């Protein structure tokens, strides 16, 4: 009897295993990424305080912009894609040139698709290649794939450091190769994908290859009321960081009752303790006020013992007297520099980001900022441009923020997904409250038991999109509310 039961179980399980193994990542809701770095707050690395206070990345030797002209091939069906295009020596010289960032539909490849509730593909999650009615655009273009290739020269000062490859936005799923070696996979069209490519790069010339799928299982969570466009549509760049480095930090402030004093808390998470060479580090947090006026002393400093592994974030606190408060009416910003040095005093990296002292709370059935009740006068904003689609320029974002201020709008909801990181910087600087919304919308599946929010196998995909948004944007003073999604 036991043998019969085991054989029966085996017969039931084997087809499931075979099906799982035969599913590509872009049709598997349980695989949202492979080898992608954990989400982190937005920061940029510099070599000195002087560089960092300018916020001019062109001065940083630890930043390499990969925007520009890439070789590009487009097909309408995955079976037609150039399967081995990432291999060294593969001839892409005859391919088209495509500017990155951009949406390929606006460059003559395929057709932009607009729909609201109804999915532009068959509603049979997680599958994307199921047949659709003849009137669907997807009937003509089942699942276009864009293959991107470009070369880059690794800067000499990246040597003996970690190299991170950062994609700020790619729709909807992608595979990445460096020098012919597969690096990883990522979904979620509205948040960054970052990969540690240290072991894949070499001195001199390198080749980066990216394969982008227009539709994936992730598309089931991206059923917003908008135009669907695809490709590498936000910035791509390389960052150089020390072998052991401050990977993520969270700055928080609490206040005494009259706001005359703030307690600043830093939660610092480090990475790179697997290195054979153990580094002892000194870390300093500096604050710069208006006109880059530096506060006289480091807010706090602490040491990192290279012989230890720090699994939990390190927490440090400091008292700040009479901080200038941030609000939409008076957006006072401080420039935060976090300096990492080795024991010999050599600066290994300076990380730069803005910070605002403010307190948000709900009491007496009202929303309060810095001890004063406020009234929301808000709009919804899609991150889109009439000419460039998803590849929204900094100038276009600035025009939106200026219009908000001119019309006395004090709040924007990033409907219905996280926007470009630069947009939050503008809201910080100009004074716009932000309701930050996760890239979760699946109303094409309805709201009953069939809703993907009720399906256990989709839980990780939902939660990761929410958490990764929060991790990226947690230090922006403009973000006063989190939205877990829309119509999902």
Per-region residue spans from a language model:
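Short glycine/proline/serine/threonine-rich loop/turn segments at secondary-structure transition edges
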Residues: 158-161, 201-205, 319-333
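Extracellular recognition modules
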Residues: 209-211, 335-339
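N-terminal pre-domain segments of enzymes
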Residues: 21-65, 69-71, 78
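Bacterial Sec-dependent N-terminal signal peptides
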Residues: 1-23
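Beta-strand-rich binding/interaction modules
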Residues: 178, 261-303, 314
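Short acidic/polar inter-strand loop motif in beta-rich domains
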Residues: 214-220, 341-348
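Accessory beta-strand-rich segments of carbohydrate-active enzymes
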Residues: 25, 37, 56, 73-75, ...
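Active-site-adjacent substrate/metal-binding segments within catalytic domains
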Residues: 102-154, 158-166, 171-177, 184, ...
